[in-house]
């Protein structure tokens, strides 16, 4: 296995840890989510290009599309929380009410 | 014979002259009220000729003028029946109307539409005459509806006032309910006797007359404000005082009683309807007398007094004494119209004050009105040898000695004592004591129009009973012998009412303020009858229609069944099922620890 995969895999792990461990801002976990998506994109592109996996040439672009959608979703949730509370502190979300 | 018929025709035609001459614009003349008044006075004088002819020769006339149309087998004509009832009632009604018109020249003097007012009064009088002299049911119905319409127009005379419009509408609606009974009776007579003429109806022997007589009883209930259809009469006091004096005391409200009196040959043999009439009349007289005990508006007290006397007339019909009821109609017209005119004089002098709690001390200030009021009150309660005595005492005596319903008799006696009680109340609050009105008014009764009209009715209240009673032909034999206590019963009950009321009224001067108790509240709110009937039924129908139209169809079926119910259900179930508390960081941390643990466990297992 080429060493570059280890590098990209490490980037993914770093972003994952950053997603799961954060202090107060919801925005930082969303950014780490983007980081995860980015590393996945790079890994997928490198794999497809190195192995001449021609039929999977579309896969990175599709991944990007879905990443964009989920980023938009996450941002809209952040904006809704921020509209209600003024900040995006995650400790505000301790009150679930329907 | 010629004198009889020509006098009657001249009387009736003279009354229509001021109306027909509208095209010659006499009604824009300033002295049109005087013209109408003198017309009515001349009509009265001419109509006494047939009355005297009838009293001294017993001559009855039927004038059958004009054949209008024949509808298959029904012949409709214009015919006048001038028998005992109509020939005596016409002069009485015309006399009272003459006095009231003279009074209303004074009362409505500052009204710009006084000519219009007199035209309405005259039209009312004409339709009342049509009703009284009708020989067939169609003509009677024309007169019946005519007095109803004129009552509506006259009650709502001051139409800028919302209460007056409501009262006029109430009068029309309640009268309409009675008209249903009238039309039912007309239809029954058309189907079963093929005629609307009284002669033919009375000549045929019928088997079961319950339906038409019940219809006529319903019509009398509506027109004469018996219990169940009574609220319009106290509300009709929104009209001017001359209207109250003419329509709602002497003439229009007796139309229902007059109808029942006309049909006495049919009612003589029908015990069911007589019992129903008796109970209805007894109920009415007691209820309205109880309501009159606590009213504070002088016109409403007199209106309830009218209603109570009408109940007494209906009771008289119920014990099969139509001629006594008719006598009471004639005598009652005099003193009741006079009572209303006195109240009009008081109201006008006190600058339109109608509340008796704000009157007082008028004994020395308005001497003639005071005299007339006291004599009217005494005549109303049946003081021996005044007018009311000849009819009222006879009625009570006959009721006491006849084989009748004991409850009805008892209620009539109680109502008689209540009559004395509320009459004492009027006298006490209006005339006696210290004045409670504004000091800065001019109390003046010095107008010849007012004085002459009240004096005329005053003489009538004192002497008319004697004159009428001793000149009419005896129709039913009055009960001559009865135990002493029964003979004295009416007088004793009246004295009891007087004394009790006087005591109570005197002691109210020295009481502390007490909150009203339930019987008081019952009496002053008219037995809760108008409140329940006028508001409950419309509220129920309107709220039911609102619920059906907007809530059932729109809200429920279109809005709530699928869309809102789905969202509501989802929300409720998610609240029930979810038990999270929103500790996101903790959840993420546990996720990460799980990942690390799994990494270690799965990689270093060996």
Swiss-Prot record, chain A:
InterPro entries in alphabetical order: NADH_UbQ_OxRdtase_chain4L/K (IPR001133), NUOK/Mnh_C1-like (IPR039428)
Subunit relationships: Core subunit of respiratory chain NADH dehydrogenase (Complex I) which is composed of 45 different subunits.
This protein's name: NADH-ubiquinone oxidoreductase chain 4L
Transmembrane portions of the chain: 1-21, 29-49, 61-81
UniProt keywords, alphabetically: Electron transport, Membrane, Mitochondrion, Mitochondrion inner membrane, NAD, Respiratory chain, Translocase, Transmembrane, Transmembrane helix, Transport, Ubiquinone
Main localisation: mitochondrion
Matching Gene3D superfamilies: 1.10.287.3510
Pfam families in UniProt: Oxidored_q2
Family: Belongs to the complex I subunit 4L family.
Catalysed transformations (reactions): a ubiquinone + NADH + 5 H(+)(in) = a ubiquinol + NAD(+) + 4 H(+)(out)
């Amino acid at each position: 296995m080429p060493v570059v995969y280890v590098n990209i895999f490490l980037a993914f792990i770093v972003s994952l840890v950053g997603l799961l461990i954060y202090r107060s801002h919801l925005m930082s976990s969303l950014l780490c989510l983007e980081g995860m998506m980015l590393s996945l994109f790079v890994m997928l592109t490198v794999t497809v290009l190195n192995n001449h996996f021609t039929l999977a040439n579309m896969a990175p672009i599709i991944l990007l599309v879905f990443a964009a959608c989920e980023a938009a979703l996450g941002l809209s949730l952040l904006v809704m929380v921020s509209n209600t509370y003024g900040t995006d502190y995650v400790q505000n979300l301790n009150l679930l009410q329907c | 014979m010629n004198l009889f018929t020509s006098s009657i025709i001249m009387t009736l035609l003279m009354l229509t002259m001021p109306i027909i001459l509208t095209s010659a614009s006499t009604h824009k003349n300033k002295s049109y009220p005087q013209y109408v008044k003198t017309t009515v006075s001349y009509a009265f004088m001419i109509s006494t000729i047939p009355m005297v002819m009838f009293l001294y020769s017993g001559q009855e006339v039927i004038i059958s003028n004009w054949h209008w149309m024949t509808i298959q087998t029904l012949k409709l004509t214009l015919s006048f029946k001038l028998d005992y009832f109509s020939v005596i009632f016409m002069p009485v009604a015309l006399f009272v109307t003459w006095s009231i018109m003279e009074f209303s020249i004074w009362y409505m003097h500052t009204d710009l539409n006084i000519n219009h007012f007199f035209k309405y009064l005259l039209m009312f009088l004409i339709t009342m005459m049509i009703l009284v002299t009708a020989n067939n049911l169609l003509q009677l119905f024309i007169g019946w509806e005519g007095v109803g319409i004129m009552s509506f127009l006259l009650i709502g005379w001051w139409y800028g006032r919302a209460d007056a419009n409501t009262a006029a509408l109430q009068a029309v609606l309640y009268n309409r309910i009675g008209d249903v009974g009238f039309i039912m009776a007309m239809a029954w007579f058309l189907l079963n006797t093929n005629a609307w003429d009284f002669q033919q109806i009375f000549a045929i022997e019928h088997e079961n007359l319950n339906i038409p007589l019940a219809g006529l009883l319903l019509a009398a209930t509506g027109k004469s404000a018996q219990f169940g259809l009574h609220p319009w009469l106290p509300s009709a006091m929104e009209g001017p005082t001359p209207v109250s004096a003419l329509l709602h005391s002497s003439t229009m409200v007796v139309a229902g009683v007059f109808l029942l009196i006309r049909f006495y040959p049919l009612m003589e043999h029908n015990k069911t309807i007589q019992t129903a009439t008796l109970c209805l009349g007894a109920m009415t007289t007691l209820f309205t007398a109880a309501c009159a005990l606590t009213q504070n508006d002088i016109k409403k007290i007199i209106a309830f007094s009218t209603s109570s006397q009408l109940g007494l007339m209906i009771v008289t019909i119920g014990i099969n004494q139509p001629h006594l009821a008719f006598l009471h109609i004639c005598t009652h017209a005099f003193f009741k119209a006079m009572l209303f005119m006195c109240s009009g004089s008081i109201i006008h002098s006190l600058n339109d004050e109608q509340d008796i709690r704000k009157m007082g001390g008028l004994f020395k200030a308005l001497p003639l009105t005071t005299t007339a009021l006291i004599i009217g009150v005494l005549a109303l309660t049946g003081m021996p040898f005044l007018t009311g005595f000849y009819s009222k005492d006879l009625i009570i005596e006959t009721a006491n000695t006849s084989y009748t319903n004991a409850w009805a008799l008892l209620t009539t006696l109680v109502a008689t004592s209540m009559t004395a009680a509320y009459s004492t109340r009027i006298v006490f609050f209006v005339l006696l004591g210290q004045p409670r009105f504004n000091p800065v008014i001019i109390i003046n009764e010095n107008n010849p129009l007012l004085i002459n009209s009240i004096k005329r009715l005053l003489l009538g209240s004192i002497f008319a009973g004697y004159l009428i009673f001793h000149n009419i032909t005896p129709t039913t034999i009055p009960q001559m012998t009865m135990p002493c206590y029964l003979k004295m019963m009416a007088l004793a009950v009246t004295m009891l009412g007087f004394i009790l009321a006087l005591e109570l009224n005197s002691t109210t001067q020295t009481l502390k303020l007490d909150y009203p108790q339930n019987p008081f509240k019952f009496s002053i709110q008219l037995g809760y009858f108008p409140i329940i009937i006028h508001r409950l039924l419309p509220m129920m129908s309107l709220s039911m229609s609102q619920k059906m139209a907007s809530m059932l169809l729109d809200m429920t079926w279109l809005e709530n069944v699928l869309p809102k119910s789905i969202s509501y259900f989802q929300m409720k179930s998610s609240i029930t099922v979810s038990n999270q508390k929103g500790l996101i960081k903790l959840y993420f941390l546990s996720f990460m620890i799980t990942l690390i643990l799994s990494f270690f466990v799965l990689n270093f297992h060996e």
